[in-house]
């Protein structure tokens, strides 16, 4: 699974996922299913926000290429992927500026068009079950919830799907591609079933023997985001970097 993650996700996403796991004391080399899940969630959050801007009249528009007008601003502020301290700083700043209530839990995005925080979910189970779990945890009508599945289903608060159909279809296509690529490598069943994942982990550790824990070869590409997070969220060039990996995975 670790090899799959490094082959199929943009290096910037992989680096952010590793950083997130290490912040919580988790090892991407051991908890590989969680590693894959975090990368998937990060990519969906980026895809959700990409190409969406607000013009000088406050209208939401889509810009897919070129250098947009300087008056345009990103419609979504990405909170997911930041370290906790910085993420809460961003949330507090948004609350102070807009007057919205501070959420109890860190959300994934802030929608400047609808003036609300958004929680993005990606589930391997039924969307309505995961939606209810999210809603029961958040317990706030202020935070909008949008759930995607690997089977093309989705569910959102009050059936408000926020994005246009094409943008949502792009996300669903990417999730379906990830599922197909996992299945072709025999990884999907263990990704879906925790019990199967534990069995696979024991098998992997046994096969690795005394080499377990040694560093593996990683991409030498270093994301500027790790040097300074802010430009990544505001720089339009991140779109091109991520876009290349959306609809394809390199085969072994």
UniProtKB/Swiss-Prot annotation:
The keyword Transit peptide does not apply. The keyword Cytoplasm does not apply. Signal peptide: none annotated. Pfam families: Flu_PA. It comes from the Viruses. The active site is at 80, 108. It is found in: Host cytoplasm; Host nucleus. Keywords: Decay of host mRNAs by virus, Eukaryotic host gene expression shutoff by virus, Host cytoplasm, Host gene expression shutoff by virus, Host mRNA suppression by virus, Host nucleus, Host-virus interaction. One of its GO terms (biological process) is viral translational frameshifting. InterPro entries: PA/PA-X, PA/PA-X_sf. The record marks 202-203, 206 as: Important for efficient shutoff activity. The record marks 195, 198-199 as: Important for efficient shutoff activity and nuclear localization. One of its GO terms (molecular function) is RNA binding. Belongs to the influenza viruses PA-X family. Plays a major role in the shutoff of the host protein expression by cleaving mRNAs probably via an endonuclease activity. This host shutoff allows the virus to escape from the host antiviral response. Hijacks host RNA splicing machinery to selectively target host RNAs containing introns for destruction. This may explain the preferential degradation of RNAs that have undergone co- or post-transcriptional processing. The probable endonuclease active site in the N-terminus and the basic amino acid cluster in the C-terminus are important for the shutoff activity. The C-terminus acts as a nuclear localization signal. The C-terminus is recruited to host protein complexes involved in nuclear Pol II RNA processing. This is Protein PA-X. It comes from Influenza A virus (strain A/Hong Kong/156/1997 H5N1 genotype Gs/Gd). The gene is PA.
